[in-house]
UniProtKB/Swiss-Prot annotation:
Cellular localization per UniProt: Mitochondrion inner membrane
Higher taxonomy: Eukaryota, Metazoa, Chordata, Craniata, Vertebrata
Name the UniProt record assigns to this protein: Cytochrome b
Organism annotation: Calocitta formosa (White-throated magpie jay)
Residues the record lists as binding heme b b566: 98, 197
Cofactor note: Binds 2 heme b groups non-covalently.
Family, similarity comment: Belongs to the cytochrome b family.
Keyword set includes Metal-binding: yes
Length: 380
């Protein structure tokens, strides 16, 4: 009898065990689609980014012109750039929904998978930040100046660290060239970390909406979930192409159509929409070091989530108090995102401070209390 190549070939076996014969819970919902969508986002970004890098010049005097040249003179350069810029937004939509799913259904109790996931988020944020600097428009260079300057809040070594990061005494040519190098390198680091993320996931198997062990009821990944994922791919690519073709600059900043002017500061320096929640938390604390610590804590708090789990149940499916808190947290993040896009004046300052306080209170205090209360009410 002939050997089944798919199950016996050293390389094919890895693919088979990850994408074809993988035992998967029979009841996972559409919320479990976002992992594979993130994979598609990453591939799309690497391909479009590679094509863009062939025409880009990492020099302060030429960067803006090279991006302009790409959009005007390169075959479909405008489309590749629009797909790349809007692909980043979709990447963040998918990753935020993916994290939200993990929080809601208790997937964070797979601690290794969760921790690698948080590291992936941090790497993605770094990649996107250095990428946003590359077109060298007004918001690019000033964004780089403001965000890198935050490192100067670190006591004793701060100023040295910033100058080392800049490669000089201000954001200039060395900064741009190193940011381009980082932006080229980091997506491949993300790809490597993704494999580690999947390795840890396949050690324990996927969680499911009920949060109960599903060993007794598994189905093969292919054809059931490969078809389900394919539907997700099609829908996401429709959204991406629609955005890139009909309204490519909707999520960008008009300031970035102006080449960098080091002597003229834009009226409102603000990051892209996906960083606004963290930016609002940074701005809500009047002290520089305090703001930087709050900014870091707003993302690093995800590492603490598994330690704050006090419920006897894994998922929030049957926990109404926690569900209310979870949706309150979603609303709070939307408010922070909105406040981050507004100027620093009354009433936005106080709204931002209250929303920042609520963000940390819900995660650190209210979630554990609600979980303990639910245990008590259900006599668990």
């Amino acid at each position: 009898m002939a050997l089944n190549l798919r199950k016996n070939h050293p390389l094919m076996k890895i693919i088979n065990d990850s994408l074809i014969d993988l035992p998967t819970p029979s009841n996972i919902s559409v919320w479990w689609n976002f992992g594979s969508l993130l994979g598609i986002c990453l591939v799309t970004q690497i391909v479009t980014g590679l094509l863009l890098s062939m025409h880009y010049t990492a020099d302060t005097s030429l960067a803006f012109a090279s991006v302009s040249h790409m959009c005007r003179n390169v075959q479909f350069g405008w489309l590749i750039r629009n797909l790349h810029a809007n692909g980043a937004s979709l990447f963040f939509i998918c990753i935020y929904l993916h994290i939200g799913r993990g929080l809601y259904y208790g997937s964070y109790l797979n601690k290794e998978t969760w921790n690698i996931g948080v590291i992936l988020l941090l790497t993605l944020m770094a990649t996107v930040f250095v990428g946003y600097v590359l077109p060298w428009g007004q918001m690019s260079s000033w964004g780089a100046t403001v965000i890198t300057n935050l490192f100067s809040a670190i006591p004793y070594i701060g100023q040295t660290l910033v100058e080392w990061l800049w490669g000089g005494f201000s954001v200039d040519n060395p900064t741009l060239t190193r940011f381009f190098a980082f932006h080229f390198l980091l997506p491949f680091v993300i790809a490597g970390l993704t494999l580690v993320h999947l390795t840890f996931l396949h050690e324990t198997g996927s969680n499911n909406p009920l949060g109960i062990p599903s060993d007794c009821d598994k189905i093969p990944f292919h054809p059931y979930y490969s078809i389900k994922d394919l539907l997700g791919f099609v829908l996401m690519l429709i959204v991406l192409v629609t955005l890139a073709l009909f309204n490519p600059y909707m999520l960008g900043d008009p300031e970035n159509f102006t080449p960098d002017k080091p002597l003229a500061t834009p009226p409102h320096i603000k990051p892209e929409w996906y960083f606004l929640f963290a930016y609002a938390i940074l701005r809500s604390i009047p002290n520089k070091l305090g703001g930087v610590l709050a900014l870091a804590a707003s993302v690093l708090i995800l590492f603490l989530i598994p330690l704050l789990h006090t419920s006897k149940q894994r998922s929030m499916t049957f926990r109404p108090l926690s569900q209310i808190l979870w949706w309150t947290l979603v609303a709070d993040l939307l408010i922070l995102t909105w406040v981050g896009s507004q100027p620093v004046e009354h009433p936005f300052i106080i709204i931002g401070q209250l929303a920042s306080f609520a963000y940390f209170t819900i995660i650190l205090i209210l979630f554990p209390i609600a979980s303990a209360l639910e245990n008590k009410m259900l006599n668990l």
